[in-house]
Amino acid sequence: MNLLDPFMKMTDEQEKGLSGAPSPTMSEDSAGSPCPSGSGSDTENTRPQENTFPKGEPDLKKESEEDKFPVCIREAVSQVLKGYDWTLVPMPVRVNGSSKNKPHVKRPMNAFMVWAQAARRKLADQYPHLHNAELSKTLGKLWRLLNESEKRPFVEEAERLRVQHKKDHPDYKYQPRRRKSVKNGQAEAEEATEQTHISPNAIFKALQADSPHSSSGMSEVHSPGEHSGQSQGPPTPPTTPKTDVQAGKVDLKREGRPLAEGGRQPPIDFRDVDIGELSSDVISNIETFDVNEFDQYLPPNGHPGVPATHGQVTYTGSYGISSTAPTPATAGHVWMSKQQAPPPPPQQPPQAPQAPQAPPQQQAPPQQPQAPQQQQAHTLTTLSSEPGQSQRTHIKTEQLSPSHYSEQQQHSPQQISYSPFNLPHYSPSYPPITRSQYDYADHQNSGSYYSHAAGQGSGLYSTFTYMNPAQRPMYTPIADTSGVPSIPQTHSPQHWEQPVYTQLTRP
C-alpha cells in the first residue's frame, strides 16, 4: 500500500468532487483508488470527477491499450502474466451454428461497452468483493447520467473500434445464436396440447378416477382379469374407431382444466356435458365396449347411499339415477328391490325413510327360483305408475340375497320395458360375478345401488342414466318392441320431463 502515499492529495480532491456522486459504490471506488489517476481512467470511469480534472485528459482514452489503465495496474498484470505461455491456451471457440471450426467473431463494442469494460476492470481490481451484477447496474445508471461531452471519448473510441472491426472482418455479418431453451419450451407446449385432447371414451374412464381406493376396489372386485392394474397407472381408454371425432368437443366440455400431473383425469361433471352431443358419437361406438368395462363405474366406496334431501343430486358414479327426482325407472327398480329383498338389516342408514311396502298380492317369495315373469313386469309397471308413491322415492338401503340377483338375471329379458338398450345376450356375463357383487353390497351395506345394478339386470347400462335426469329434460320415451307393457306416461311426476332412451341393439 506504499503506492498510496504519493496520491493522497489526489484522492482528497476526488472526495471533494464526490459529494454529489450518484451512487455510493462508485464514490467509494474512485476515492479509494490506489493507483495514479493521471491517465484519465478515473475521470472516465466515474461521473463526478469530470469537474475536478481538465477536460483534455479524457482524450487520452483513445490512445493505445497501455494508456487505458494506471501504471500500477499494468505492472501488476504483467507481473502475474509473465510466467505463462499464452500460445498453449486453447482459443475460446464459441460454436457458430453453421461453421464449427471458425472462432466466434464478436461484435464491435458500442460506446457504453467501451465505458463499462474499462470501468469494470478498474473497479473489479480495486474492489474484488463487488458483485458483478451490482457493478453492471451501477455502471448502467452512471452511463445514463453522463452528458454528451462526458460520453464523447467513449463514442469516438467505439467508432474507431467499429472501423477497425470492419477492416479486420470485411464479410462480418451479425448472426445471433438461437436459444435452445425456446425450442424446449415449444416442445413442452406441444406436449401439453397433446395431453389436453381426451378421447370420448376417457369420459367413461374418468368416472373411475373419482377416488383412488374406490377405483382399485371396484376394478379388483368386478373384473379382476381386466382392471386389477388400473389402480396403479393412469386410466387408459379402450381404443375405438372414432376416437378422434369427439376430441374437440370433449375439450370444450372440460372447461380448460388441465390433466392432473399424476396422469389421472379429473372426474367429469356431467351437468356440463350435453348428452345430445355425446349420444350421437359415443353411443354409436358403444358396441365395442366389453360389458365388464362398465363394472368399474359402479358406486365408489366414499359415496353416500341415500340422497339426504328431496331434489338433491348425488353423483355416485353408478349408472343408476341418483337424484331423488323420481323417474319411472328408479321408482320401478327401487320398489322391485323392496319387493324381493329380505328384511332390512339393523345398520340401515337413519336418514332413509321407510319406503311403503308393496301391495301383498304382488309379493314374490325371496327364495322362489322361478317367479312368474309376467307378474314381475306388471309389478314394475304398476309401481312406477303410482304417483303418490313415486313422489317419495327416497331409496331404501338394504342387503339383497344372492337369489335376488340370480332371479333378476334369469328374468332380465322381461325387463326390457326399462332397458331399451336391448342386451339379452349380455346377461350370461353376470352370473360369474354374482358373488362378488353380493360381497360388495355387504361392504357397502347399500342395496340401493344394486337395486339398479342387479335389479335392472341387462338394463343396467342402458340409456346413460348417470346423467342427472332432472337436468336433461330433452327426451320423450320410445315405446319398446318387446311386448311388455310400456311405461305409463300419464302418471309420471309433473316436474320431470320424460327422457328419450335411445334403443340400441348389438348387431
UniProtKB/Swiss-Prot annotation:
Keywords: Acetylation, Activator, Differentiation, DNA-binding, Isopeptide bond, Nucleus, Phosphoprotein, Transcription, Transcription regulation, Ubl conjugation. GO terms for molecular function: beta-catenin binding; bHLH transcription factor binding; chromatin binding; cis-regulatory region sequence-specific DNA binding; DNA binding; DNA-binding transcription activator activity, RNA polymerase II-specific; DNA-binding transcription factor activity; DNA-binding transcription factor activity, RNA polymerase II-specific. A motif (9aaTAD 3) lies at residues 458-466. PROSITE patterns: HMG_BOX_2. A motif (9aaTAD 1) lies at residues 275-284. It comes from the Eukaryota. The keyword Phosphoprotein applies. It is found in: Nucleus. Residues 63-103 are annotated as: PQA. A motif (9aaTAD 2) lies at residues 290-298. GO terms for cellular component: nucleoplasm; nucleus; protein-containing complex; transcription regulator complex. There is a cross-link at K396 (Glycyl lysine isopeptide (Lys-Gly) (interchain with G-Cter in ubiquitin)). Induction: Upon lipid starvation conditions, expression is activated by FOXO (FOXO1 and FOXO3). Disruption phenotype: Perinatal lethality, with cleft palate, as well as hypoplasia and bending of many skeletal structures derived from cartilage precursors. Heterozygous mice die shortly after birth and display skeletal malformations caused by impaired precartilaginous condensations. In embryonic day 12.5 dpc heterozygotes embryos, skeletal elements are smaller. In 14.5 dpc heterozygous embryos, bending of radius, ulna and tibia cartilages is already prominent. Premature mineralization is observed in many bones, including vertebrae and some craniofacial bones in 18.5 dpc heterozygous embryos. Residues 224-307 are annotated as: Transactivation domain (TAM). Acetylated; acetylation impairs nuclear localization and ability to transactivate expression of target genes. Deacetylated by SIRT1. Phosphorylation at Ser-64 and Ser-211 by PKA increases transcriptional activity and may help delay chondrocyte maturation downstream of PTHLH/PTHrP signaling. Phosphorylation at either Ser-64 or Ser-211 is required for sumoylation, but phosphorylation is not dependent on sumoylation. Phosphorylated on tyrosine residues; tyrosine dephosphorylation by PTPN11/SHP2 blocks SOX9 phosphorylation by PKA and subsequent SUMOylation. Residues 56-67, 160-174 have a biased composition (Basic and acidic residues). Residues 30-41 have a biased composition (Low complexity). Residues 63-103 are annotated as: Dimerization (DIM). Residues 1-67, 160-250, 335-429, 477-507 are annotated as: Disordered. Residues 42-52, 378-420, 483-507 have a biased composition (Polar residues). Expressed in the intestinal epithelium (at protein level). Expressed in progenitor cells in various organs, including chondroprogenitors, osteoprogenitors and preadipocytes, but is not expressed in most differentiated cell types such as osteoblasts and adipocytes, with the exception of chondrocytes. Highly expressed in developing chondrogenic tissues. Also expressed in some non-chondrogenic tissues such as notochord, otic vesicle and neural tube. Transcription factor that plays a key role in chondrocytes differentiation and skeletal development. Specifically binds the 5'-ACAAAG-3' DNA motif present in enhancers and super-enhancers and promotes expression of genes important for chondrogenesis, including cartilage matrix protein-coding genes COL2A1, COL4A2, COL9A1, COL11A2 and ACAN, SOX5 and SOX6. Also binds to some promoter regions. Plays a central role in successive steps of chondrocyte differentiation. This is Transcription factor SOX-9. It comes from Mus musculus. The gene is Sox9.
